[in-house]
Swiss-Prot record:
<feature type="binding site">
    <location>
        <position position="102"/>
    </location>
    <ligand>
        <name>S-adenosyl-L-methionine</name>
    </ligand>
</feature>
<dbReference type="Pfam" id="PF01795">
    <property type="entry name" value="Methyltransf_5"/>
</dbReference>
<dbReference type="GO" id="GO:0005737">
    <property type="term" value="C:cytoplasm"/>
</dbReference>
<feature type="binding site">
    <location>
        <position position="55"/>
    </location>
    <ligand>
        <name>S-adenosyl-L-methionine</name>
    </ligand>
</feature>
<dbReference type="GO" id="GO:0070475">
    <property type="term" value="P:rRNA base methylation"/>
</dbReference>
<keyword id="KW-0949">S-adenosyl-L-methionine</keyword>
<protein>
    <recommendedName>
        <fullName>Ribosomal RNA small subunit methyltransferase H</fullName>
        <ecNumber>2.1.1.199</ecNumber>
    </recommendedName>
</protein>
<comment type="function">
    <text>Specifically methylates the N4 position of cytidine in position 1402 (C1402) of 16S rRNA.</text>
</comment>
<feature type="binding site">
    <location>
        <position position="109"/>
    </location>
    <ligand>
        <name>S-adenosyl-L-methionine</name>
    </ligand>
</feature>
<keyword id="KW-0808">Transferase</keyword>
<keyword id="KW-0489">Methyltransferase</keyword>
<comment type="similarity">
    <text>Belongs to the methyltransferase superfamily. RsmH family.</text>
</comment>
<dbReference type="InterPro" id="IPR029063">
    <property type="entry name" value="SAM-dependent_MTases_sf"/>
</dbReference>
<dbReference type="InterPro" id="IPR002903">
    <property type="entry name" value="RsmH"/>
</dbReference>
<feature type="binding site">
    <location>
        <begin position="38"/>
        <end position="40"/>
    </location>
    <ligand>
        <name>S-adenosyl-L-methionine</name>
    </ligand>
</feature>
<feature type="binding site">
    <location>
        <position position="85"/>
    </location>
    <ligand>
        <name>S-adenosyl-L-methionine</name>
    </ligand>
</feature>
<dbReference type="GO" id="GO:0071424">
    <property type="term" value="F:rRNA (cytosine-N4-)-methyltransferase activity"/>
</dbReference>
Length: 300
């Protein structure tokens, strides 16, 4: 894939209007925890905000840099978003007006076939979002049966995690599982026939679980959100969009535990009692938004 092709793969920013509506009046500094191709960051730069954006994947960062090269107030960091405290200048920490987390995996990663994120492509198992050494191949072919069961159960919420882990180990003992298509076939043919053709492909949650393990996604998320109170200024706002229940549970728990109410001290005022969802119109025009859940909190 050449650079021209890469620049054509532009992820439509999810719930953009809603995101921008929560930026405080007279805001000056924003942090985009999940830059991707830069759609949300660009919109904030267009509002004349100084934006500090994090992206762990150097390939997609290059796309965003080219797209945003004419913005003087764009600052980027090629790192995971749990490293904000280490990366941001001391003059920024505690003075941020607005923070955004868009936790969805970018369209770029599914389109860039050599990563093996999609079981629709017959490519080597990889699934790395950044420079981490462990790949999906290493997890599938190197983890013990017990470790595989844990990953499938905890990160895929797969009811037959033990059976599926056992099947994977038996198959890899015959020969290494090299590609996404091989793994998909193993899962499909070891799923009950009654469940093979449901709304969700039987491999979907397995691939999700492996991807989360490879990239340590939930641990990084928990560490990062714990730093939000230190990074935001008073009355600053954070918006988090999640795309599966594991992420949303972490966000909901963190906000609830740190919510200020009449009966307890806390750090945040919750700006929405129920999660905000994309409109039907957005889902039609941008199907990738369909599972998005938005939570918003203000530091008090």
């Amino acid at each position: 894939m050449d650079n021209n092709e890469e620049l054509e793969i532009v992820h439509t920013p999810v719930m953009l209007k809603e995101v921008l509506s929560f930026i405080p009046e007279n805001a000056k500094i924003a942090v985009d925890a999940t830059l991707g191709e830069g759609g949300h960051t660009k919109a904030m730069l267009d509002l004349n905000l100084e934006v500090h954006s994090f992206e762990r994947d150097s390939a997609i960062l290059e796309i965003a840099k080219k797209r945003l090269k004419n913005y003087d107030k764009f600052h980027y960091y090629n790192n995971t978003y749990d490293k904000m405290i280490e990366e941001l200048d001391d003059s920024i920490i505690g003075n941020v007006d607005f923070m955004l987390y868009d936790l969805g995996v970018s369209l770029f990663h599914f389109k860039k076939a050599e990563r093996g994120f999609s079981f629709k492509d017959n490519v080597r198992l990889d699934m790395r979002l950044g420079l981490n050494e462990k790949s999906a191949y290493d997890v599938i072919n190197g983890y013990s049966e017990e470790e595989l069961e844990r990953v499938l159960r905890d990160y895929g919420e797969i009811s037959n995690a033990r059976k599926m882990a056992n099947v994977i180990v038996k198959e890899r003992n015959r020969r290494k599982i090299e590609t996404s298509r091989e793994l998909e076939n193993i899962i499909f043919h070891n799923t009950d026939k009654s469940q093979r053709y449901g709304k969700i492909h039987p491999a979907t949650l397995v691939f999700q679980a492996i991807r989360i393990e490879v990239n340590d996604e939930l641990n990084i998320l928990e560490k990062s959100i714990s730093n939000i109170p230190s990074i935001l200024k008073q009355n600053g706002v954070v918006v988090v969009m999640s795309y599966h229940s594991l992420e949303d549970r972490i966000i909901k728990k963190f906000f609830k535990e740190n919510e200020k109410t009449k009966n307890k001290d806390g750090i945040f005022k919750l700006l929405n009692n129920k999660v905000k969802l994309p409109t039907n119109e957005e889902i039609k025009s941008n199907p990738a938004s369909r599972s998005a859940k938005m939570r918003i909190a203000q530091k008090v």
